[in-house]
């Protein structure tokens, strides 16, 4: 395959990203502290802390293997002419432009899924199983994979078909039309996800009447939060790990509590967690997140429309017959490093939002200690990293390290 300047730029950018990931991974392992921080005395015992250190090392090593595998697959497919070979195969079916594009992009997606499946199986049934987290049966795992593939085929295929048609026929402003369409679909999906998507994978039940529901509803009322529903999700079907999150907008918005969270925390702690989630809404973090996602879509489509019409992009990947669908596929490889930069910005914003929601919850409930205790228990039960390296936090973390959050709540941060 012939090379050009863009070939070397893209190759070096992706190799550089891999090296940065490797350095961050190693630094994160070196940052592990053999002694338990004082704030967590009485939360972890010695055996639990040893287990945390082993789990962090195991997951870090697995991440390094996964990153190496991903890079090897990309380089092998790219340098052996895979993008052009697949293009010639789908063109030989003599279908229309949209169908050919969907077959090409769908083939890439399916191939990536197949090659990533062994790693996902190993992570679920070896690493998570070894440390007592996994509750997923092979049947549940297989069902989740099939559902995910079908959702990707139906929803992803429909969106891709529209994007391909718009970019093909929309002229110079096509990216704007595609951006508008994708933005509307994003908002619709955020609205419909609680009713249509989440129930496909998990059973959602209303929180039963009792002290916890009364306290949560009273807290929501005090904070002026029109809570449509408090749902308990059967997260224990798949893992012992716990979480809570806010989902939906408008009339579909709800707070979702994992059943493992409800089981392991006091009423005060759960009310504080709920207040934290309400804080994201009251402080308009949800709106900012949606706006940020829409801006990212716009940046992607603007750059994509500009670059997929450049012959040098196709030459860099050995694609002999330019097309919009092949252009989008190879542009994704170029966009990866840029996406990492945008991800760093989004991560910094997200961590600020978490601190702000913590402050909101502490002030609104007068229970900073309860939220701090909830964070400590979550970290212990999930074996979360108490002291990740700063570079690792900057590159990957949407939440601040739990130790920093606890210290901020205790007035020590």
Where would I find each of the regions flagged by the language model?
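Alpha-helical transmembrane segments
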Residues: 330-334
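Polar-ligand-bearing catalytic/cofactor-coordination segments
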Residues: 3-322, 336-413
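Glycine-rich, flexible loop segments associated with nucleotide phosphate handling
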Residues: 323-327
